[in-house]
Amino acid sequence: MQIYNPISPVKTMVKIYPHLAFPVDMDVVQDKILPYLTTEQERFTIWMKSLVFNSKGCTVFDSKGNLIYRVDNYDSKSWSNEVYFMDLNGKILFTLRQKKLGFFKSWEGYNSTGTRFRLRKIFKILPRESSSSYKVVMGSRIVDGDQQSCYKIVNRGSVFAIKDGSGRLMAEVKNKLSDISGLDLGDDVLTMMVEPQLDHSLIMGIVIAYKLTKCKL
């Protein structure tokens, strides 16, 4: 069994959180990761790298720089059709599986209660190069065969937003800027804003599934 052994890439993390030392205090983080419901607008940093040596994945920090989520793929050569989205202690929050529906591919998120969501690209007859859309169908509708979108992801350049069925913004993800210089930290460092009264573990699971459709993990 692979043992989780976080590696401290100090130079990179200093650029992301210049005011923090690394590694973080895990006992402090453990007390703060639950519940997952946002009480106010919250920001998270998504680092598209794994802390496990020679692995692919991503690492998610809260606004204080505490590690809260991670994805680690121990096969460094390629992704399998099944990916695990975990909390900092390695507890699996969502199992993400790639599905093929005829000519179309989708990613589905499962947890202990069953299928939670399915994400698939919306294909347009006259697509615009500057944008693309994905629909997210939640668990109960997947079981009933209802393909009506519960959420929608709209991608414009380096920014993408998650909206509910009425068009209300739920979350937005974009490249993060340095707190010191204001410079773009690159495609590997993202900032995610999540609106109040939302399950940010579910939002993050959807973001991971979206990144998998674009082979960005």
Curated annotation (Swiss-Prot):
It holds the Pfam family LOR. InterPro entries: LOR (IPR007612), LOR_sf (IPR038595), Tubby-like_C (IPR025659). Might be related to the phospholipid scramblase and tubby-like superfamily of membrane tethered transcription factors. Belongs to the LOR family. This is Protein LURP-one-related 3. It comes from Arabidopsis thaliana (Mouse-ear cress). The lineage of its organism: Eukaryota, Viridiplantae, Streptophyta, Embryophyta, Tracheophyta.
